[in-house]
């Protein structure tokens, strides 16, 4: 067997193995219950959310609604490459809340209530967790919430 043929076979094997590894990783889609409390306490959220907008997940009690601005959805993704599921979920969760805060301030809202997980338009309500979808390349958190102005404590 010639040296060129050996190199060609080795290259073909390596290329095929790489495609197999990448396609296997990309096909991964694990649903992870991600703790809202953990997410809210993380530096990713703590450093970016300024407190002007309050977030109420599931059916958590909130002050009286004075004005409604509508229901909005955000679907935030972040790289999962060489990052733990927990870290990529934290980042995606933080990105979703940052988007909600930005939208609320644009609308004049001071709260987002009834926040639910909304991945693939599947509405799942929880006071304690959101769904994080971790894949081989990307991790995503999709949230749906009602933007309102609330009064009082």
Name these PLM-found stretches.
Residues 39-81:
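Compositionally biased P/S/T/G-rich terminal and signal peptide-adjacent segments
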Residues 71-124:
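Short, well-ordered alpha-helical segments
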Residues 8-20:
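Bacterial N-terminal signal peptides
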Residues 20-27:
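Sec/Tat signal peptide C-region and signal peptidase I cleavage site
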Residues 28-33, 42, 153:
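Glycan-processing catalytic domains of CAZymes
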Residues 1-5:
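N-terminal secretory signal peptides that target proteins for export/translocation
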Residues 63-66, 105-106, 135-138:
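Extracellular/periplasmic catalytic domains that process cell-envelope and extracellular macromolecules
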Residues 79, 91, 114-153:
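Surface-exposed short loop/turn segments
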């Amino acid at each position: 067997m010639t040296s060129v043929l050996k190199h060609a076979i080795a290259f073909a094997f390596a290329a095929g193995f790489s495609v197999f590894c990448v396609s296997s990783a990309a096909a991964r889609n694990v649903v992870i219950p991600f703790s809202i409390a953990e997410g809210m306490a993380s530096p990713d959220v703590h450093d970016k959310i300024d407190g002007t907008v309050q977030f109420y997940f599931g059916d958590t009690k909130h002050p009286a609604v004075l004005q409604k601005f509508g229901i909005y959805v955000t679907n935030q993704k972040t790289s999962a490459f060489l990052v733990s599921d927990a870290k990529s979920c934290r980042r995606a969760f933080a990105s979703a809340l940052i988007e909600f805060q930005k939208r609320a301030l644009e609308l004049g809202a001071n709260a987002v209530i009834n926040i639910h997980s909304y991945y693939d338009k599947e509405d799942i309500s929880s006071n304690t967790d959101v769904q994080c979808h971790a894949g081989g390349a990307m991790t995503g958190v999709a949230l749906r919430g009602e933007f309102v102005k609330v009064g009082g404590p």
